[in-house]
Amino acid sequence: MKQAIVARADIGMGEGKLAAQVAHASLSAYEDAGPKPRKAWKGAGQKKVVLKATSESELFELADVAEREGLPHAVVRDAGHTQLDPGTVTALAVGPAEDELVDRVTGDLPLF
């Protein structure tokens, strides 16, 4: 079981902003999962990987694949209180789900 969080590298988020957006995505996708995968993921140590995307369109393409695969996922839009304009798409989380299923969506992306 794992979760992959894909964050945009093209919008110049500072380290703190990046950390916050990754956390938002992780929690939102966790909440999208059913009780069985949530329990399994928590019991297995909540494995996560943070990956890099280069555009908003790339995040939406990945989200579409996750949707078609029936995987829990969440797209995060920033509230715009600090560094980014309101509504800026910043991150996508896929999973928790079996590693192989998450990799079908995010397996070709580089580490952040």
UniProtKB/Swiss-Prot annotation:
Enzyme Commission number(s) from the entry: 3.1.1.29
InterPro entries, alphabetized: Pep_tRNA_hydro_II_dom_sf, Pept_tRNA_hydro_arch, PTH2
Keywords: Cytoplasm, Hydrolase
Pfam families associated with the record: PTH2 (PF01981)
GO cellular component: cytosol
Compartments reported by the entry: Cytoplasm
GO molecular function, one term: peptidyl-tRNA hydrolase activity
Catalysis: reaction(s): an N-acyl-L-alpha-aminoacyl-tRNA + H2O = an N-acyl-L-amino acid + a tRNA + H(+)
GO biological process terms, semicolon-separated: translation
Superkingdom as given in the UniProt entry: Archaea
Hydrolase among keywords: yes
Class of this enzyme: hydrolase
Entry's family note: Belongs to the PTH2 family.
Role of this protein: The natural substrate for this enzyme may be peptidyl-tRNAs which drop off the ribosome during protein synthesis.
PANTHER family (alphabetical): PEPTIDYL-TRNA HYDROLASE 2, PEPTIDYL-TRNA HYDROLASE 2, MITOCHONDRIAL
Name of the featured protein: Peptidyl-tRNA hydrolase
Annotated gene: pth
